[in-house]
Regions:
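Short glycine/threonine/proline-enriched tight-turn/helix- or strand-capping micro-motif at secondary-structure
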Residues: 12-21
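Glycine-rich beta-strand-centered segment in the early N-terminal region that forms part
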Residues: 21-37, 50-94, 111-113, 131-134
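A secondary-structure boundary/capping signal
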Residues: 33-35, 123, 169
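Cytochrome P450 core scaffold surrounding the K-helix E-X-X-R motif
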Residues: 41-48
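Mid-domain Rossmann-like dinucleotide-binding core that forms the NAD(H)/NADP(H) cofactor-binding site
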Residues: 84-85, 132-201
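Short, Lys/Arg- and Gly-enriched loop/turn segments at beta-strand edges
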Residues: 92-102
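Glycine- and charge-enriched low-complexity intrinsically disordered segments
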Residues: 114-127
Length: 201
């Protein structure tokens, strides 16, 4: 199968299309045929080898995507072959508050391959079904930016009608936060380092 790897050095020119054996799902795992991907600012940090995001060479980048389940290992019961699913950004963070031990294996970063491949394998517990009303491309934007914004406003912020929400710039997390805050009846204030960006939002 074809995958994209960070090879030989860091930076966008380090990305190379290479061949790897198609993965086989083990017990409680599913095999996905990937259909769409989404690029976040974090991908630039990973590909450029910046700070804690610096991966080993040979890493498959990109954390967000959508695929179709094409095979399942023994013991898989919640997800079925043919389901359209998205891997979660932190496959080991299944519940509870943020903690370092749950965050160490973010997809496509320092400790785990990402989804920029024809096929990927994940634990059944680490994928979620995608709503039919969303296209593959729309759903592929949710795992990092969408869930980050939702978690900030719903779990930490508990935004209610009439609240004010300040977002920084017009990146993916900010635009999701703007939409979610408006859905909850909040007033949204966008800040920016230039005068042009807020007027376009």
């Amino acid at each position: 199968m074809k995958v994209v790897e960070i090879r030989e050095s860091f930076g966008p020119d380090s990305l190379q299309l290479v061949e790897r054996p198609e993965p086989v799902p083990g017990p409680a795992q599913v095999l996905l045929k990937m259909k769409a991907f989404s690029i976040n600012y974090r991908e630039l940090l990973v590909v450029n080898g910046v700070g804690r995001w610096k991966p080993p060479l040979g890493r498959v980048p990109v954390s967000d995507g959508v695929g179709i389940v094409v095979a399942a290992g023994t013991g898989v019961s919640r997800i079925k072959i043919g389901d359209r699913v998205s891997p979660i950004f932190y496959p080991k963070w299944l519940e509870g508050r943020v903690a370092a031990e749950k965050m160490v294996r973010a997809l496509g970063g320092a400790a785990a391959d990402g989804v920029l491949a024809e096929y990927t394998v994940f634990d059944e517990a680490s994928v979620v079904r995608v709503p039919a009303r969303l296209t593959d491309e729309e759903a592929a934007t949710l795992p990092c930016a969408g869930v980050t914004a939702w978690n900030a406003l719903s779990s930490f912020g508990d935004i209610t009608p009439g609240d004010s929400v300040v977002v920084l710039g017009t990146g993916g997390v900010s635009i999701f936060a703007l939409q979610f805050a408006r859905m909850r009846g909040a007033r949204v204030i966008i800040t920016s380092s230039t005068g042009r960006m807020p007027s376009r939002s």
